[in-house]
From Swiss-Prot:
Function: Catalyzes the condensation of ATP and 5-phosphoribose 1-diphosphate to form N'-(5'-phosphoribosyl)-ATP (PR-ATP). Has a crucial role in the pathway because the rate of histidine biosynthesis seems to be controlled primarily by regulation of HisG enzymatic activity.
Pfam families, sorted: HisG (PF01634)
NCBIfam families linked: hisG
Biological process, per Gene Ontology: L-histidine biosynthetic process
Assigned keywords, A-Z: Amino-acid biosynthesis, ATP-binding, Cytoplasm, Glycosyltransferase, Histidine biosynthesis, Nucleotide-binding, Transferase
Disulfide bond residue pairs: none
Name recorded for this polypeptide: ATP phosphoribosyltransferase
Species of provenance: Acinetobacter baylyi (strain ATCC 33305 / BD413 / ADP1)
Biological classification of the source: Bacteria, Pseudomonadati, Pseudomonadota, Gammaproteobacteria, Moraxellales
Domain remarks in the Swiss-Prot or TrEMBL record: Lacks the C-terminal regulatory region which is replaced by HisZ.
GO molecular function, one term: ATP phosphoribosyltransferase activity
Compartments where located: Cytoplasm
């Protein structure tokens, strides 16, 4: 939710060093849209709409919080390395990234979907070594290894549905919500690899050093999640 209230703290500067405050990393799209009501419960409202701006750093109505807008896959990296104090990322992204150096504190129970395999409708399972197109290279390898299948994984960054249609891959691995995009391209979901929801993660050093700032926000967000 956008808010036209100004942040009049004279020490508030969204650019540059922000040691006196908290930096929150979010990604555009569904996660941002579904996270904003939870942040509102903690008194954090954006002063501008990221969907209508080219800016990447945004002030909020909370005097000690600014928000970074990133690619979803970059959120764990920013939090892990201390460029952001906390963030919201999908469980799929966290598992793929291998974010061992952050605390995963809360399942926000938003942006729910499934990581699944998918292929052309009615196709026979190919013999021999499979070709799998995906942006989830690590999770894909782990999944097929658990089945005892050898696969060649082809890294893509988008439009996964195209791969089986043009012979680039036998199957894809991607997140599935309604399945409408798959069906529109003659594909069908097959096997579920994992259920996915968005998680609140915190930099380990920030969790200790900025605990007095973080604790009230985390408690209010958790309460908002529990009341949904």
């Amino acid at each position: 939710m956008m808010n036209d209230m100004r942040n009049d703290d004279p020490n508030f500067n969204v650019m540059g060093n922000f040691d006196h405050g908290l930096t929150l990393a979010l990604s555009k799209g569904r996660i941002l849209k579904e996270t904003l009501p939870l942040l509102e419960a903690a008194g954090i409202n954006l002063l501008e709409d990221p969907e209508k701006s080219r800016k990447l750093i945004f002030p909020t109505t909370h005097q000690k919080v600014r928000i970074l807008i990133l690619r979803a896959s970059d959120v764990p990296t920013y939090v892990e390395n201390g460029a952001a104090d906390f963030g919201v990322a999908g469980k799929d992204v966290l598992m793929e990234h291998g974010a061992q150096h952050v605390y995963e504190l809360l399942d926000l129970k938003i942006a729910n979907c499934k990581l699944m395999t998918a292929g052309k409708v009615g196709m026979q399972h190919p013999k021999g070594r499979l070709k799998i197109a995906t942006k989830y290279v690590n999770l894909t390898r782990q999944y097929y290894a658990s089945l005892g299948e050898q696969v060649d994984v082809i890294k893509l960054y988008g439009s996964m549905e195209l791969a089986p249609l043009v012979g680039l891959g036998d199957y894809i691995v991607d997140v599935v919500d309604t399945g409408n995009t798959l069906r529109a391209n003659g594909l069908e979901p097959l096997e579920e690899i994992m259920k996915v929801s968005s998680r609140l993660i915190v930099n380990k050093a920030s969790f200790k050093r900025k605990q007095a700032l973080l604790d009230p926000i985390l408690a209010q967000v958790e309460e908002a999640v529990n009341q949904r």
